[in-house]
Structures are given as C-alpha cells and as structure tokens.
Amino acid sequence: MAMFHSLPSIHVKHQKNTAELESVIMPVPAEVTISMSQHIGAPCKPVVKVGDTVKVGQLIGDSEAAVSAPIHSSVSGKVKAIEQIFNARGAKSEAIVITTDGEQTIDETLAPPAIGAELEDVLVAARACGLMGLGGAGFPTSVKLVGLKSAAIDTLVINGAECEPYLTCDYRIMLEKTDLLLEGAELILRHMPGGRAVIGIENNKPKAIEKIKADAAAKGSKLEVLELKSRYPQGAEKVIVYEATGRVIPEGKLPSDVGVLVMNVGTVIKLAEYVKTGLPLTSRMVTVDGGAVAEPKNVWVPIGTKLEDIINFCGGYKGEPAEIILGGPMMGTSCRDDQTPISKTNNGLLVFNEKEAKMAAETACIRCGRCLRACPLSLSPAALDRAYHAEDVEALKALHVNLCMECGCCAYVCPAKRHLVVYNQLGKQMIKK
C-alpha cells in the first residue's frame, strides 16, 4: 500500500513556551515512589526490603527477562514501603516508596564502566545504566543495541525532532549537553563500520541546529544534522526514518528491518554520560507547562517524584486545574491525579485549565476526507471508524489498523470531532480477541 505523501501532515501550534528557559534542578522531595514497571517488557522485582537504607544509583529493582531494564534509587534514604500503585502509564504496578534523607549520598560502588573495542561492553553498560528510550516508548536500550551485531544496520538516526506542542526538554538537552550528544553518537558509530549517523531536528530549533553543526565540525564528528520541516508528526519513528533515509518500515516491522537504529537524543546523551560517570538513570528533564501552572519550566526531576511536588516547585497551580497530561497533548496520557510518580519515559507534565482541556462534542462523520489527507501513513481513519463501530474485524485488518501509530493527526483536523485515535486503539484490541 502507499505510505507517506509529499504534502505536510498537519501544522499544530508549537506552544514552545519554555524553549529559552535553561533547565533547573528541583530540590529532593520528602518521598519518592519508584514504579517497577517503567519500560516495555518484563517488570522488575524489588531487590531491597522495607527498612533498608539506599543510596543514589543503588540497584533496587531487576529482572532476569531478556527484555527489561534495571531500576535504581533516585535518592538516598530509607525504604518505607513496597506497594501496588497506578503508575504513569495508568496501569497497576509494584512500587518502592523511599523516604529521603536530603543528603543524596551516591552509592560508593558506582564507577564508569570498562568500555573496550567489543560491542558487548556497550550492551552491558546500557543495561547497567537502566537505560531505555527516553522519548516516550521506553524500549530497553541494551536490547535495541543488540541489532548492531547485524551488519545490515548501517544508519543511526537520532531523533531530535520534538514535534509535540509544548515540549522543549529535548531542545534544551541538545543545547546544554551537546558534547555528550556527539560522544554518544561516536560511541555507537564505532560498532557500525562504514555507517552513517544523522540527527533529525525540526527547523523551528535553529539554535540547536547551529550549535550541533558547529560543535560537530570543531570536534571532527561524523554526526550529520538533518533539518526537518516543522510539521507534525515529524518525530514519529516511521516518519523520521523515511525523512532521513528514504526507507519505508513495512507494517509489523521495525527500523532494524530496514537497516536503521533509531534513538532519542536524550537516550544517546545519557548513554555517553553513564560511560563517563557510572551514574545510572535516576533523573530526567521534564517540560512542565500549561495554563494551570504558575511558572512553566524545564526541570531535572528525580525518578519517582510525585507530580504534586513538581508542580509545587513550578509555583503551584494557577487557578483551577482541569486536566493533567503526561507527555505531549497529541500523544500523551491523561493522568488520574497529581499523586502519580514521574517515570523514566515522562518527557512532559502539562496542566491545563478548563478552557484548554475542554473537548468539543462528537458529531457524525461528514465524509470530508480531511483525516485521510492528514494521515502521514495514508490510512483512512473514517473508514476505520466505521469498521470499528460495525465490529468488522476483517475490514479493520484490510484497512491496516495495526499500522496506525496513534499520532492524533486525524482527530486534530476532524470537523466532527470524532475520537478517531481511540477507535483505532479499540480496533487493534478487537483484532487481538
């Protein structure tokens, strides 16, 4: 089937309100709640018990499963409880509650990993770091990097597009940690003989483009900078692979099947940082914004910090909050309440007021075709809508519902305000039954 088209997908209001604000580090909260399920794959099991004293970077959760990533304490303090919570994905998971001591004492056993000429050293380091995709998906990095054992992978695509409205944490980290970005790219390129590394950045981020180009030239880095048009969903995996290489990822396949390794910019930077310092993934930068936040910021947050504590650090609520979203407004998830703890994959915390959160009433499809023209994969969302409501599983398959990447373009442009993404999600579940 045809995929992609020459016309832009959709243009959304950028709302990059925090783009020029340097990141800040929030104080350690009184308590953190660290979920044992923060990644795609098997959840971790606690390796500490109630009453144990823990330090920053200490291993507190692990799994023997092939697809998983260990979890480390983001604070120093004492384990208060091990309990079931609703995590940032809205699912129930086991979690470790730690009362902090305010000292942030680092685990003395931590040390930079030994990185030699073998790829295995990098795989071991990525796993020991507890690293996963920091752009939202959360796939364990050590598992993804196994693909480098195949000579078929010849291109590293670093995703710096950050096309979601409001979010600017990737932009800030590109500006603030450019050296580590280049070091991370070179580390991966060593295990991709004759390979190419390219970072895709939307052209509404000229400072990042210019800085990375200048620093790469000064250091003799092989990293190429690809200026992307500012359109949504430019940062979607299938889209950025096509833009960077001209290759199309077939339905049901991965970037590795077309010779590409895709990594978020924050993931590459953290890998390089871990190789230098030996400090695992215990904190991340989060964009905090929205009309119901008093002081929007880009904040370095200890993993497991409650949303309430982050919002209070940003001046508290401005008026009455109507909705909390983790991630961006297009693909993020609505949150139960502000007691939810932040996870490794949460790049945004948006707090909307009633005006921003208000949804228009859904009406009948008028068959205008806007959703079809907006879809970057040339699917037919209106036809999928009808197939779902008719419970026509064969039609859902024929219309390639599983190819939908749930970017939200169709629902964004729909004049009838149809919940098209939701129907595609439910359609996928219908096929599995």
Question: Which stretches of residues belong to each language-model region?
Answer:
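Short, well-structured beta-strand-loop connectors
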Residues: 49-62, 81
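N-terminal, Lys/Arg-enriched amphipathic/low-complexity engagement segments
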Residues: 1-47, 97
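Conserved hydrophobic positions within beta-strands
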Residues: 77-79
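Ferredoxin-type iron-sulfur electron-transfer modules in oxidoreductases and energy-metabolism complexes
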Residues: 347-362, 372, 376-433
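Gly-rich Lys/Arg/Thr-decorated short loops/hinges at beta-loop-alpha junctions or inter-strand turns
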Residues: 133, 156-170, 292
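Internal alpha/beta scaffold segment
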Residues: 115, 121, 172-220
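Hydrophobic alpha-helical positions that pack around
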Residues: 194-307, 313-318, 328
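Acidic low-complexity segments
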Residues: 81, 86-139, 146-151, 206
